[in-house]
Amino acid sequence: MRYETVIGLEVHIELLTETKIFCSCPTEFGGEPNTHVCPVCLGLPGTLPTLNKKAVELSVRAGLAAGCEITRISRFDRKNYFYPDLPKAYQISQLYLPLCRNGSVTLDSGKIIRIKEMHMEEDAGKLMHSPDDNRTLIDCNRCGVPLLEIVSEPDMRSAEEAVEYLEKLRELMRFAGVSDCRMQEGSLRADINLSVRPEGEIELGTRTEMKNLNSFRAAERAIKSESARQISLIENGENIIQETRRWDDDAGMSYAMRSKEDTSDYKYFPEPDIPPVVVSTPDIEKIKNQMPELPQAKRRRWSEEYNLGRADIDTLMSSPFTADLFDRTVMLCKSAKDAASWINVELPAVLRGAGMSIEDAKFSPDSLGRLINMLSSGEINRGTAKKVFAKIVTENADPAEYVRKNGLSLMTDAAAIEDAVKRVIAENEKSVSQYRDGKTQAFQYLIGQCMRALGGKAPASAVTETLKRLI
């Protein structure tokens, strides 16, 4: 019998706010444990939450980016459960009236993955297990960090579709300016709801939820593993238990954590300390007008205006920084081909050599465009341009200023070039004679001698032209 895998995803993204959703504590990643906390996010008695307006605006922006309907009046609810990383013993979330509904993400195949809803909530803390002394430590810095939970419909049928959906969603949220979606820092986390059923069956099977997926590769492996596990249970006549499972990527397997809760288990009730969230039509229009160009539109424009291929576009779209760098560079240098080459080939090489990531690159986007113009005008050669570009990326150097200070400009004095070429001809009569006898390698040798005599500061085209004329 053939089986069909049915997959739905719950994706949590941390919103790009400077402070937490209900207090003024910073959201900065990587602080000393339990230093970004206050009585509000620790849930101490007598404290009251104050909603972060920026979190609401970013959530609306996310909904608009995914084509969602924006709920004009939404509400918060309390999700009650006990866990050591949840100081209040309840999480403020949205169940009954979420902020965004009915969006979608389109895969490359044209298949539409429906988004059921997006709702705001606060993050929990982080548990760190210490096997050496058998202790579990709690870091509450993450408590109260604003999250947007994006819940898909169970529209995906393979691990590949699920991973593509995650990639498309991450790209959309990053380019919309909603979240940095760094999985390694936990600002994008995905839970997988999965069941299997015989092909042609309408009724869904018993689902399990998979957690601890810290990469797209882990998500793909977990889906394939869980699908195979469930099919094996069915074929052996065993029942599938509705449960939450933890994925161990090193072992390539999952294990049961707890039975899967239903909504009723959390005893939701309306949050009494936060008034309804009202989003007016003018509010929505204002956010729409502030929206940047979204990935699908940007890809289409680059393809139509610049005739860029899919591979170049995919690489440029790997981060909002490189996409913005390309647009700014093309505006200055007017050559999409040159801009794409420098960003897709030279930039990664410089970053690797310096041990940097793209997030570490803080240079002005205008610098590359000006550097390409200096190269195309003959002011510098390509070797010099590469050296200058490395300084731009690693030290935010100004290209024109760096070239001037270090005397890297190419020689433009035709008389000086001619004098140097004449000296080389006089000193290399044998090579000149060989060239005149038809040995082209001798000409390349003479070019090299001329460039050496000029300290590498003359345009190769000018040296070649002068040598041909004088020989």
Predicted regions and their residues:
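Structural motif
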Residues: 1, 330-339, 377-380, 437-441
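Basic, nucleic-acid-interacting segments
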Residues: 1-293, 304, 308-310, 331-335
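Amphipathic alpha-helical core segments of compact helical bundles
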Residues: 16, 193, 197, 228, ...
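Core structural elements
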Residues: 186-198, 303-327, 336-354, 366-368, ...
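Amphipathic alpha-helical segments within well-ordered protein domains
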Residues: 299-303, 327-331, 348, 369-376, ...
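Strongly charged, low-complexity linkers/loops
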Residues: 358-369, 373, 382-452
